[in-house]
Amino acid sequence: EAAAKHAWLLEHERELAVASKAAPGAVELVRALHAAGCRLGILTRNAHELALITLAAIGIGDCFLTEDVLGRGEADPKPSPDGLLRLAARWDVAPQKMLMVGDYRFDLDCARAAGAQSALVNLAENPWPELTDWHARDCAELGRMAGLLV
């Protein structure tokens, strides 16, 4: 019974992943970061395979190495810093040189716990200023703040 429920959940999540739409400015920001030579990773509570489907559906799958997409089976869930620290180790970079971009407190908590910088996006107001290094209404605004988008 548990296997059947898991299979149903994955199929439901797969349907959502295929139909995914990018947040405003996200595709442009990711493409600009990728073009600038930035190493990009994903930390998600979704399954790894579904994250890859989502990235492909919104047209940025080619900007991420498969092993840099960490789903619920590859790292402890946020707010644990586990996933961010795994990426830092894989990339041989200090967490302090990394920026965690997210839309919820757990993303910001994850960044703080890892020693990384944080950017809160897709919220008009910032309910967690003590955890936020950067705040932008959307990814396009974050890209402009970083000098990557006009």
Spans of features found by a protein language model:
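Glycine/serine-rich loop-strand microenvironments at binding/catalytic pocket rims
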Residues: 20-42
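Asp-based, Mg2+/Mn2+-dependent phosphohydrolase catalytic module
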Residues: 27, 31-35, 48, 52-150
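Conserved phosphate-coupling serine/threonine residues in phosphotransfer and NTP-handling enzymes
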Residues: 44-46
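Metal-dependent phosphoesterase signature
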Residues: 1-28
